[in-house]
Amino acid sequence: MAAPALSGDQIRETFLKFFEGKGHRRLPSASLIPEDPTVLLTIAGMLPFKPIFLGQQVAEVPRATTSQKCIRTNDIENVGRTARHHTFFEMLGNFSFGDYFKKEAIAFAWELVTEVFQVPAERLAVSVFEEDDEAFAIWRDQIGVPEARIQRLGAKDNFWASGPTGPCGPCSEIYYDFHPELGNDGLDLEDDSRFIEVYNLVFMQYNRDAAGNLTALEKQNIDTGMGLERMAQVLQGVPNNYETDLIFPIIQAVAAIAQRDYASESESVKVSLKVIGDHLRAVTHLIADGVTASNLGRGYVLRRLIRRVVRHGRLIGIDRPFTAEIAETAIALMAAQYPNLREREAAIKAELTREEQRFLETLERGEKLLAELLAAATDQIRGEDAFVLYDTYGFPLELTQEIAEEKGLTVDLAGFEAAMAAQRQRSQAAHETIDLTVQGSLDRLAEQIHPTEFVGYGDAVATAKVTALLREGQSVEAAEAGDRVQIVLDHTPFYAESGGQVGDRGVLTGESLIVRIEDVQKESGFFVHYGQIERGLLQVGDSVTAQIDRACRRRAQANHTATHLLQAALKLIVDEGISQAGSLVAFDRLRFDFNCPRAVTPEELRQIEDQINQWIAEAHGTVVEVMPIATAKAKGAVAMFGEKYGAEVRVIDVPGVSMELCGGTHVANTAEIGLFKIISEAGVASGVRRIEAVAGPAVLEYLNVRDAVVRDLSDRFKAKPEELSDRVTALQEELKANQKQLTALKAELAIAKSDALVSQAIPVGDAQVLVETLTGVDAAALQTAAERLQQKLGDAGAVVLGSSPEEGKVTLVAAFGPAIIAKGLKAGQFIGGIAKICGGGGGGRPNLAQAGGRDASKLPEAIAAALDQLKTAIAS
């Protein structure tokens, strides 16, 4: 039986539901910005669970399943050139934390692939680690896979380790066979032309010590990964991942802008279209998760991807800004699974436009130098010059080659590579003398000074010693007024950002010294105070008075305790199974993300708000205790899944209301919160909702703003506040009636115009052809006019009408009679092709179709092309 043609969204949902049915908790995708400071981006589905696998924290559930968005750029040059390399991909995974192991994981995987996804068993082959006889036996004896379809591979391919020491274990992979007719002789699972790996099962069963010895782990874990794009390729029967419904709509949108037909293009054009389709998925998610383009870290990854998009756009003839436009397609394609894309759409488009424009200016400068080089060259551009273009101006080598070829010249690639190698050597030599970044400097300082002691739970002011001082990430001995610095103290009352709560603000003072502290972060065990010296000189070893801004701290405390009350109210009113997925506790607001498959209703939100304000009014005392984590769990304390906890934990208890593990600062009594108000509730990812709220003085500030808006509306509508709703409803009904009347008038006008146009039809053979532009007619009226004209012209009538009802927008309509359709002309296909001239597309039925475009300046060209094409097609 052939594999069912499931959509990418259906494959994802089927996978997650399957494992929910096997006792796994569905968890949302983590951000592309990982909590692990050693990793630049989230590169695998297991990364959010790495602390659990390494034994650094205890799992809150025994089984979990996720669809994790990931980014990898290590094979970026292969993107678009192979069937399966990507920068952005989704990794479907099922995980066991000390629960089931090899036998169950293999059985689950086989059941899912063969019974649920209905992939024929004869199309599958598996690999095991060469020494893993247990897995081999399970596949052969319990699953029934023939020995000839099981291949033993070495540690390079089939043994996972987190590092030279620590948890590790063998892997087993399921491969899809595109050519089973080739048989099993000489089976080579690494043959990419025949096999594709679709499912990887990692069995974490050993601990490796410094001597390389393996000992069995007490708790064995399972980590699996199924590439969504790869499984979509298999189930949808397409030749590569790019032609699945997960990516191809983006490629089609790019092709429309470039006026290209993907199916008939050369391989080089297809590569560029695939690169753009892939990278647009990556950059939209990176920006949505808070990354901005820069020359460092994640920002550089984003900048590089955007520039590759622009470069490949130019290679296929796109000579205008287009990334923000294509982002609309990417967002529309993925927003159902990742609602934050829609919420961040404006920011995504703005960042893309800004970075694209910056790169286009860079290219423009490079093109001027290239023009000079072309004029001076006889047969070849020197490699050193091409490298200057690349290194100094950011001008891609491929673009230099393309332009040179147009002039009949070549580029000295060997010279370019030599210049590149020399630059790498210079960079490596320079790196040895460069001062370290903040993180690197602190790692070095950790060998010399003790971690910061936090005294801020009880003290708002403390005398402390400056143990380290950094300026622009470099360790210095002193800094002066005007310098922006990072300061490490031996102990501090300043809370460092963690657990969703922002870092404290305040001042450091000394003799003739004032340092304004704007933020505090925790790095390598140190509390790093970020601020600016307003007066005086600060030196390592100085004694300073550290004082937090008490007003800011009180607001943060109120918001943090209110967040705990919010989670308790959600569990009480909506669903006991709700769990925290993230939070923000700022001075002016709070945000709480939680796992929930549906929206919280307005009535539930009202009940939640009322319940929290009731708890506030009841003036519950807050009890803070430090206890063993096992004791806390036994008492029913709520922990956030995925958060790191030590053996001893801090418990915040509002007796009878809430008990949570938390390291943040809180009010001593709920009455100190004052008031609580929900601002909004929305989805941020599949199965994840977000509530934003204010507490304490911020409620009054929020209500004052709302009150000012209501007063302004009352003045505008000359109505009392309580009458505004009725007044707006009346205006909406009036507007609706006016719009209906306007539409009718436009239709009458279009019909009147169309009646006058009948005489302008021209005979082509035995057909009557009418192609015209109507001014200011909307889509509905244009369609009515086209239908009426075609009916008047008869069965052999062909009508194409165009209009630009809004600035920059184009509407096109085609109406064909039966005799025209009999000649092989179909309105949908015809008008869709014409619309490409205006940068758009569309379609419809053979007899009537509508299309749109984005470039009104091309409307005359489109109308002329429509007439020419109709004449040619009908005459032939």
Curated annotation (Swiss-Prot):
Assigned keywords, A-Z: Aminoacyl-tRNA synthetase, ATP-binding, Cytoplasm, Ligase, Metal-binding, Nucleotide-binding, Protein biosynthesis, RNA-binding, tRNA-binding, Zinc
Name of this chain's protein: Alanine--tRNA ligase
Family, as annotated: Belongs to the class-II aminoacyl-tRNA synthetase family.
Organism superkingdom: Bacteria
Function summary: Catalyzes the attachment of alanine to tRNA(Ala) in a two-step reaction: alanine is first activated by ATP to form Ala-AMP and then transferred to the acceptor end of tRNA(Ala). Also edits incorrectly charged Ser-tRNA(Ala) and Gly-tRNA(Ala) via its editing domain.
GO molecular function, one term: alanine-tRNA ligase activity
Gene Ontology CC terms: cytosol
Catalyses which reaction(s): tRNA(Ala) + L-alanine + ATP = L-alanyl-tRNA(Ala) + AMP + diphosphate
Main localization category: cytoplasm
Cofactor binding mode and count: Binds 1 zinc ion per subunit.
